[in-house]
Amino acid sequence: MSYRELAWRVTARELESSLEEEKGEGERPVAHLLSPFGARMNRVLIAGTLSPPEPVGRDDPPTFWRSRFTDPTGSIPVTAGGFQPRAMAQLRTIAVPRPSVIVGKVHLYRGRDSVAYISVRAETIRAVAEAEERAVLADIVRHSLDRLDLLERVEKEPGVSDDTLAAAGAPGPWIVAARAALHRYPT
């Protein structure tokens, strides 16, 4: 049985700083982007402002669209195409910079020069009022701070068990992500 991975609440800055990737195995491997802030992301939830989109490619009508997503910490490209028809339709209708909440898959591409390019392929896009955008951003920051607290504890207490961390309220995926982040981003 397949399941959808949880969408990690992250900022543009956290996405921009996530340069380590874990690739799964098997017939349909799942890739995860590891954040130095303690997230192991396949899907993300982001909140900020989307710029008006532009078509990519030469198809007529366009089958792939790109926009720029900006939050108080930075900006990241957001895309949608034929495999995400609802998100593509939602993205195409944005006429002016608009506060939005987006759920999508994170994608890391390394160019020939080995420079990392990170984008989010939107699954859903929802235009929101500024008050809702601020509330979602506050929730994202709370999650980031809680994950950083967990990272600090795992770093200071390397022998602490997953059961002890879970009993203290840390969600299982956060524990796995914290350990992976400390392994990939040693301090």
Label each residue range with its predicted role.
Residues 1-40:
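OB/S1-fold single-stranded nucleic-acid-binding modules
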